[in-house]
Amino acid sequence: MRILNYSAPGQYFITNNIQDHHWILGHVANQKMVYSEYGEIVKKEVLKIPEHHPRIILDEWVVIPNHFHLLIILKEYGFYNGISEVDDYNMQKNHEFYFSHKWWNKPKYQPTKKEVEEYCKLRRRMIIPKLMGKLQMKTSKDINILRKTPGTKNWQHDYHDHVIRRRASYINIKNYIINNPKNWKQDTFYDRA
């Protein structure tokens, strides 16, 4: 079990897939995304991400037919006027969970069910999980209104997240997102229509 502080300053790469990888968000034509009405809903909500919290910067993003990628920067606490650079040395320290006396700081310790539940409750209140929960809920609700399918699950339950710890990784991920429509036919999820 990964124990991270998802409110810590840093850079986060997030991917969220449509349930069963259905191509409902649009299609790629001439290496550009052409949004369906459902894709437009997701695009609109992605662009609202910075409104969710003053520390959030939506650095890069792309919506593809059956998933989206986000590159989100959480600024330093109390720092609201720019993008901070990745500090390779301190990035790991930022994400070590801050309850050093608890089980998650002890290597090879097997947590109890209660301890895992405690961490899960804390995690739900962290910025990134809260943001993703709101994004999934709002887009699903609006898509279901258009489809006349209330309560339908549109997103996979969990999303993939990666804390970026190196400047080189940040640059590679940013370029990957930018070039995703051009490389759509080589994408892992391309053939899962």
Predicted regions and their residues:
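Short catalytic/metal-binding and nucleic-acid-binding patches
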Residues: M1-A193
